[in-house]
Design a protein with these regions (language model features):
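Positively charged n-region of N-terminal signal peptides that target proteins for export
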Residues: 1-4
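C-terminal motif of bacterial Sec signal peptides marking the signal peptidase cleavage site
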Residues: 13-16
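Bacterial signal peptide processing site
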Residues: 18-21
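Post-signal peptide N-terminal segment of mature Sec-exported envelope proteins
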Residues: 26-46
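Short active-site neighborhood of thiol/selenol oxidoreductases, capturing the structured segment around
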Residues: 62-90, 103
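Structural microenvironment flanking redox-active thiols in thiol-disulfide oxidoreductases
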Residues: 84-124
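Short, internal strand/loop/helix patches
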Residues: 117-153
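A short, hydrophobic beta-strand/beta-hairpin element that forms part of a small beta-sheet core
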Residues: 155-170
């Protein structure tokens, strides 16, 4: 009887757990937050309302890279506190001073609205374009066609640099850019 009660208690605890990071996390958003997530229909350059999160396709990002001389894609994880993760609000002006356009592309919705961004758009991978709900898989499916490398081959770098439409290099540390 004691083991049955303990097993039931553990099972109840596990069913109430929410594991962040395996999927996009869209289901974790409140209804008000979901209303602020917009599927972008036009070009990335046409975004002027920075209070929303814009789901972007691989083709929209390719088009942006092809039409700007220097582009840095930041594979952004909002809740990351590693030394390799930086605030987009700090990264964007640092790169603009070097003449580099930055696209901050979140790879998950968890904590995406905690960061204030008033000078750049917050983008999110439109996961519906890929045949998987698993974050690690859709990240590879999104970035591999752009860089020509898998996430593992790039040693899981979060900063991908392009010049004149061509992939140049990926960086783990934003200070190396």
């Amino acid at each position: 009887m004691k083991h049955l009660f303990l097993s039931a208690l553990i099972l109840l605890g596990l069913t109430s757990c929410q594991i962040a990071g395996l999927t996009s996390g869209y289901s974790h958003l409140s209804d008000a937050q979901k209303e602020r997530v917009i599927t972008l229909e036009e070009n990335i350059d046409d975004i002027h309302d920075f209070s929303k999160v814009y789901k972007v396709s691989l083709n929209q990002v390719k088009q942006y890279i092809e039409t700007h001389d220097k582009v840095l894609l930041y594979n952004y994880t909002p809740f990351c506190h590693s030394t390799y993760c930086v605030s987009p609000a700090a990264l964007v002006p640092q790169c603009k001073d070097k003449g580099i356009n930055v696209l901050v592309i979140s790879n998950i919705y968890d904590d995406i609205f905690k960061q204030k961004h008033t000078t750049f758009p917050m983008l999110m991978i439109d996961t519906k374009q890929f045949p998987t709900k698993w974050r690690a898989k859709y990240l590879d499916l999104f970035y591999s066609p752009l860089t020509g490398h898998t996430d593992k081959e790039l040693n899981y770098a979060n900063f991908h640099y392009f010049e004149k439409g061509k992939y140049v290099k990926s960086y783990k540390n934003s200070n190396d850019i």
